[in-house]
């Protein structure tokens, strides 16, 4: 199923207007958020992963992006509340359009259909695999849009890649 183009445009706009970008997710969704954080950094944005020891305070004008299949992950909800309380914007990438996090978010990027849990079970792809893969592709589409809009090439992005590996 194709993801609504308005979601792509909406998240690109949120990223573009953000002072700094903070990302979080739990479990495998957290890994997907790390993939996106790395690419945003390659595109020149100031990016932090929530929970890292060197992560600064979120403030008004910043953006928190949360990847949560359910939109109700108990360990992530306080981050959403804190971000909102200081005037930061919040974008949620989730399977559910209605959830505790979605109620607080400025932008909800629902993957799949409008059903509560929209992904069919695929044999050999347990639990949230289809959501995680769909989210990864969606977020890579965001990066593609940014790369094209900013005229970035591999050399510019590679110059920002870690060299202490």
Q: How should these model regions be labeled?
A:
Residues 1-17:
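A short, well-structured juxtamembrane/interface segment
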Residues 1-3, 19, 146, 150:
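Structural signal for hydrophobic packing residues in well-ordered secondary-structure cores
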Residues 5-9, 74, 155:
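Generic alpha-helical secondary structure signal
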Residues 10-13, 31, 159:
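Amphipathic alpha-helical interaction segments
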Residues 20-137, 143-144:
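Glycine-rich phosphate-binding loops that contact phosphosugars or nucleotide phosphates
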Residues 141, 147-165:
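A short, charged, Gly/Pro-tolerant segment at domain boundaries
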């Amino acid at each position: 199923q194709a993801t609504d183009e308005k979601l792509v445009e909406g998240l690109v706009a949120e990223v573009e207007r953000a002072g700094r970008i903070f990302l979080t997710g739990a479990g495998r969704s957290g890994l997907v958020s790390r993939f996106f954080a790395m690419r945003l950094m390659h595109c020149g944005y100031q990016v932090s992963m929530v929970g890292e020891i060197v992560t600064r305070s979120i403030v008004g004008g910043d953006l928190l992006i949360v990847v949560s299949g359910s939109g109700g992950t108990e360990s992530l909800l306080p981050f959403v509340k804190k971000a909102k309380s200081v005037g930061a914007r919040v974008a949620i990438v989730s399977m559910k359009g209605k959830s505790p996090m979605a109620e607080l978010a400025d932008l909800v990027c629902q993957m799949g259909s409008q059903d509560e849990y929209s992904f069919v079970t695929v044999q050999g792809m347990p639990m949230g695999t289809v959501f995680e893969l769909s989210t990864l592709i969606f977020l890579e589409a965001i990066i593609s849009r940014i790369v094209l809009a900013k005229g970035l090439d591999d050399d510019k992005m590679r110059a920002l890649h870690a060299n202490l590996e």
